[in-house]
Amino acid sequence: PCWKGWSEDEQNLWPQRYIQLVVVADHGMFMKYNGDLAAIRKRVHELVNNINGFYRSLNIDVSLTDLEIWSDQDFITVVQSSSAKNTLNSFGEWREADLLRRKSHDHAQLLTAIDLDDDTVGLAYTSSMCNPRKSVAWGQDHSEEPINLLDVGVTMAHELGHNLGMNHDEEKKCHCGASLCIMSPSITEGPSLEFSDDSMGYYQSFLVVVNYNPQCILNKPEDQYYYILSPKHRIYSW
């Protein structure tokens, strides 16, 4: 069964949390946008702005800490023959061994232009926020039209939700004021902009369960933002 509905007053009492996000745009993204770094930066900023908007109802501030663009080559295997799970595993290993050593952050998402799986546009570990290897997800930039930017933003927010302890919503049992909610198993009727009562309950449980109790999202981030152009890791502040 789903959790009860959460009143606005109850939501206002939820603790403030901060997620410092790094987005890694793979080489496929670099090629898709014809090497236009400004276009990629604009795309990612708009996506993160959407994600942050979705999470305000949970009292979570999502900020873009870094954008890394793999302009010359991918640093993990990202090809159509790769399985979705293998890509997630490889990205998590790379994050732990490389990215975390260069930049402190809470969660990283790989944004790819490659169709890794006909039925999957994103994948993440569950209840893994703050884990060095598993606080990751990947999502496909599967929408060609700017007007459909929300589709990709919802995908990224959905995968982040898994890291925060959320499971998929049960069909016809969970409610968010729309026909589909962000944690619905699939997007069939257009993207939803809200989390269900069930997702909110899973998240609240994740915060208090001793085995999880993610500490990294307690810290308010600095305002400084960087993007990094691979492979020499040249750093530009904005």
From Swiss-Prot:
Pfam families: Reprolysin. It is an enzyme of class 3 (hydrolase). This is Snake venom metalloproteinase HF-1. Keywords: Calcium, Disulfide bond, Fibrinogenolytic toxin, Hemostasis impairing toxin, Hydrolase, Metal-binding, Metalloprotease, Protease, Secreted, Toxin, Zinc. Optimum temperature for caseinolytic activity is 40 degrees Celsius. Activity decreases rapidly at higher or lower temperatures. No activity below 10 degrees Celsius or above 70 degrees Celsius. Snake venom zinc metalloprotease that is weakly hemorrhagic and has Aalpha, Bbeta fibrinogenolytic activities. Cleaves the Aalpha chain of fibrinogen first, followed by the Bbeta chain and shows no effect on the gamma chain. Has caseinolytic activity. Induces dose-dependent edema. Binds 1 zinc ion per subunit. Inhibited by EDTA and EGTA. Inhibited by serum and antihemorrhagic factors Da2-I and Da2-II from D.albiventris. Not inhibited by PMSF or SBT-I. Disulfide bonds join C130-C216, C174-C181. Zn(2+) binds at H158, H162, H168. Its cofactor is Zn(2+). GO terms for cellular component: extracellular region; plasma membrane. Optimum pH is 8. Activity decreases rapidly at higher or lower pH. It comes from Bothrops marajoensis (Marajo lancehead). Transmembrane segments: none annotated. Monomer.
